């Protein structure tokens, strides 16, 4: 999903502290009917190496969504392939 303006979301950490993230992209996997999101910290400087966080998510009726950690190797492989594809497209 290409975003014209960076979408931002707030994600609490394990201590309840909230952190602002920019959404890189979201994608759906038809076979599993799962949705995934990749984000980076919003306050990260441009020249720094970017740390990407990925989650599986489920949308709620009120336009909120719930994040779930990615736990299987297969899911991580799918997310990494999408990141690599995105990086290749940006370099082209």
Curated annotation (Swiss-Prot):
What this protein is called in its record is UPF0473 protein OB2006
Could you say which protein family the record assigns here?
Belongs to the UPF0473 family.
Q: Which Pfam families match?
A: DUF1292
Please name the HAMAP family in this protein's record: UPF0473 (MF_01448)
Recorded hits in InterPro entries, A to Z, give:
UPF0473
